[in-house]
């Protein structure tokens, strides 16, 4: 309010020429006021008639510049309002010996300044229920309300500023607003900021972990992509090998055709060579016979002439058949090769596409229906051996790796009582009957080592026995075994059970200290042949909250 009044008042004290507060104001006959220096400079620039810069009234001669005394006094008082008074020096009220020292702290509730050496002395003085509120002496002016000249000890929730009690309760600007003590609000803000700081630190740590995981995943993907590139290169080398094989077969076709032609050509040449030898032989005989005709005694016997003439007539009587020459139709052969090239080019020119994206970003922790990250970490800590359920290697993983989610967390969804074959469900490889989540004893591990022998038990007719290694109970692989009661429990099962993740105390450790991984099935069966074999089918301890398969 006071600030607005000052601004409005200042607008009436501004010179129209320099637009600042009047400096030695003078008044013209038209009753307009200007700074003496401003109006003098304005008229000095105008060589013609002098005019009032505000109303443009012309004067034949320059009027006298009379000082406006009333306006001068108002300007001086207005300027005095803007002059900040030097703050009064505060001295310690507890200094008794010698002159008091300058105050370093001021208690806003007690309004008592104190020096640095008497801060503890002041804090030990009795105060209001809210206690002392010390601030720096230099900040006292900032904590003072300019309107009521009182310390601002309250915090307005509506406007988020510190206010004094008069602003809150006595028709002040913050009347009706929700306020609280400034120290209480400060503690609340500190708690809120500390809580947010913890959240931000956790978020920063989470982001840092995710960045590390992203970097690790990047390196892993780069390695796998490099492996994939090598495999792709090998595949393309196989394609090159196929092309080389096709080229070899094509060249082989040409070689076979050439060999066939050369064979036919050689046969023709051989036949013509034989005809030539025969003709040369007859020609020689004919020449010798012609030489004999010079003697008249030749005419005594001319039978040789007739024989030679007949043979010559036979040789020359038939015409020579034209030879068969080779005709290579290269265009026809190249057309067939061009067809293959066209088909291959058409196949390779198409974009390389896969049915689904082969490299994509997926959530880091895929959430199951009945699982959570905390449970997974808890389970992995309690049962590190259960990791074989997630792999396909080993006898159990190969048989029950895809048996569903009933035992994926190693936890039964039903309360555990005396075990029956309808609890802790998994699917056997050969059927869909629900059985205990445990491996079937391999037939090869029984005493005689036969691959066809089944564990023959007198009271259970040779049915396969399934083991739940957490609840330490047995059941038959047959889901409905004629209404047979669950196997009774006992405290004589020969292995120790880990105590972590159990919601109940375990009974004393059995007398046999051998652990499950070191106990062979043969030892179990040997133990079943002893007089106390009925305890072999009983369970050890109380039901646990988790069931998982073991081998």
UniProtKB/Swiss-Prot annotation:
Keyword Coiled coil: yes
Pfam families: zf-RING_UBOX
Zinc finger (B box-type): 92-132, 140-182
UniProt entry keywords in alphabetical sequence: Coiled coil, Immunity, Innate immunity, Metal-binding, Repeat, Transferase, Ubl conjugation pathway, Zinc, Zinc-finger
Molecular function terms, GO-annotated: protein homodimerization activity; transcription coactivator activity; ubiquitin protein ligase activity; ubiquitin-protein transferase activity; zinc ion binding
Catalytic activity: S-ubiquitinyl-[E2 ubiquitin-conjugating enzyme]-L-cysteine + [acceptor protein]-L-lysine = [E2 ubiquitin-conjugating enzyme]-L-cysteine + N(6)-ubiquitinyl-[acceptor protein]-L-lysine
Protein name: E3 ubiquitin-protein ligase TRIM8
Gene giving rise to this polypeptide: Trim8
